[in-house]
Amino acid sequence: MLRFSLSIESRILPSFSSLRSLSPSLFFSSSRNNFVFCGKEISGETRNFSAMSACRDHRHPQDCSFLGGESFFRNILATMETVYMNKNPTAKAILDLVRSVDDDCIYYDHFAFRTFGVNGHGIDSMAKVFLDFGYVQREELRFPAKKLKAFWFSPPKVPLTANAGSGVNGPLPRIFISELLVDQMSPEAQKIVRKYTELSGNGSMHAAVASALGCLTWEKPTYSEFQQLAKESEYAAWTLVNGYALNHVTISVHRLKSHLANIKNLNQFIEENGFKLNSEGGVLKVSPDGLLLQSSTVANLTSFEFADGISESIPCSYIEFAERLILPQFKNLPEDKVEEFHRRDGFEVGNADKIFESTSMDQLTRNAA
């Protein structure tokens, strides 16, 4: 693995087990299947979130029990965002830069997470908190070459007040959760992944807590194990050392108020300010229907101390940008009448496959050049 000189100091991701000494007021196991986080009890019971059973009523997502819990749920998102910002200075710098031009108003298109599809640590483990707060599971996406699958989740319909904020206090973001199909990996890679997920115990039941606290639910791996996984799957290596951390947030470009509401203008603006974008398949990723336009930076690097005492640079997270164009049947609507449901929804395999490369060593090497 290439060694990188670090210009950025970043906190080392702690192990979940190292947090046992924290105050019970933050995290207290009240029963086998429930825990209290930030003063709220969350069910941890095991569920089967298959494509059919995970879905709430698609026709009435606003009927899900969300009212009364909205403040708590937004606090969960905010703590995930804070951990993400603290570890990814490029993302924070770009968000601050865009806010300075766009009257401090940024909305998120989606949040994304990575998981291991084994021992209960896959998509279901991270999806639970979102399903519990009214999100609806939507389409599955498959990435055969990368041995990945993903689902995206649409947010509940929550009316916004006139003084609604931006970021996590604005319209709720979509959620994109992917998982590595561990059973398709080599026996050697499977052994490493299973070793650490099994050591996690019930950690998978508290994926959202781990993400909000910025910690792993398993012990730190050795550097040699990280290297071995990276040779076969950079996604696997990333997940081994980052766990349930927020992989990226995505700015909703068309919701910006300035000239940056066009993704080509935004890309140019970002590059002119010294930030490099993921060039896999071209900087701008366009869906076959031409209605979903995406781009992203490459991941920040951070120093990570492995279990054997070796400190190395590892990829952290990145920031994405998405512009959703108006669907053909609504193209004649007056601009002030266009709402989010009039625009292209969902995700595109071809786009997402290239966005995944934002944490690849190839892109990091190009970025360092």
What are these regions (language model features)?
Residues 2-5, 20, 27-127, 132-369:
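Extended, well-ordered protein cores
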